[in-house]
Amino acid sequence: MNFNPHDYQDYAIRYIKKHPVAAVLLDMGLGKTIISLTAVYDLLFDSFEVRRVLVVAPLRVARDTWPAEIQKWEHLRDLTYAVAVGTPKERKAALMQQADITIINRENIQWLIDESGFPFDFDMVIIDELSSFKNHKSKRFKSLMKIRPRIHRIIGLTGTPSSNGLMDLWAEFKVLDMGERLGRFITQYRTNYFMPDKRNGEIIYSYKPLPYAEDAIYRRISDITISMKSTDHLKMPELVSTEYEVQLSDTERSRYEDLKQELILQLPDGEVTAANAASLTGKLSQLANGAIYADTGEVIEFHDRKLDALEDIIEAANEKPLLVAYWFRHDLSRIKNRFNVREIKTNRDIADWNAGKIPVAVIHPASAGHGLNLQAGGSTLVWFGLTWSLELYQQTNARLWRQGQESGTVVIQHIITKGTIDERIVKALSKKEMTQTALIDAVKADLEVG
């Protein structure tokens, strides 16, 4: 197939070639893989600035998406590639090929650098999903930083540069510029841009940005960062986001509050800390959805309000396909017990959904990530159980709200239990979206000028 780049794609290709260090923030559906591969091809065979390229990506993307893109496009036919996933023996066989491009999953970057026995002779690295390196304490981050000075060109690709706020940006940009813009040390970054938020005496559990932090941080990174939002460059369907509120009965409300107090009383000193907040909110989310795991692992049913709401939504859809996102295993069990649904797990499931053969499909956000195209099968997504992760939330929504969606409108419905933690999750997602949008807008490329 011949590649005829859109103007924004041509701009991004030129940007990558011009900037040895770059953060390329491309929204889902904008073709970041073909953009990167085209730039790599030119750097390898036109300007001869690069000799070997390493691509680091999530497993499914490394195994399936990158090889498929290389094979798809006519202008890339001279590229050789090897996929270093699977067993150590299979990975070593891939490395021995000395291909132009070696593609490895992010879980194995530490193995490659510290354990494989192969010299690290890649002069260009592409990180597909820069947010994979947001944790500066992770083994993959530390391993990559060890050999970072040997890398002449590095590109970070992501559509979600600050899913959980500004703090994540330090590690992501340290990988790229070795601390030139946001500082060499996380303590320095915290001191410059943040102040303690939640604390217990001398123990600080979280930080909040100083009033000037966002603008200052965005200015610091703007010279190596470009961003192009999907809605600016593609004919995207209209996105309609709605909330379907359900109300607990007085008895259920009392039980919810009682269980909440029990959970709090079980905490050390009755205090919610950063260490136990995740566990607590997880249990409250279960209650909001209608069931909770007991300490024995048994599922205790609490209410059917969300199931009732889902029944109403299915009926109102009038056989129009629905994609339902769940979070807990008991969500899935209860949905399956009540409705005739099918999980999206295999290639056959994906094909049948896109062919319109599945009236109601269920999917977990963690399995709805990169490279999963479901837009041909429907245009309505129902969130039965919410997630705190903006990255998973947006990736799941983008399975339907993307280029190629034939419906003029995509509807995202959230089933919210009033007076529960659901309302806080929706608010948190909104706040994170604002932070991320501010980042993207602050460093957006001006295509007319560029």
Predicted features and spans:
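Conserved helix-turn-beta segment of the N-terminal RecA-like "Helicase ATP-binding" lobe
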Residues: 61-86, 176-179
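Conserved Helicase C-terminal RecA-like lobe
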Residues: 1, 17-18, 31, 35-45, ...
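Conserved Walker A/P-loop ATP-binding site and its immediately adjacent core
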Residues: 35, 50-72, 163-168, 328-329
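Conserved P-loop NTPase motor "coupling/switch" region that bridges the ATPase
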Residues: 52, 78, 97, 124, ...
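SF2 helicase motor core recognition
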Residues: 109-115, 164-166, 326, 330-334, ...
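A conserved SF2-helicase RecA2
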Residues: 388-450
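Conserved helix/coil segment N-terminal to the catalytic DExD/H
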Residues: 88-122
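Conserved pre-motif I regulatory segment
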Residues: 1-25
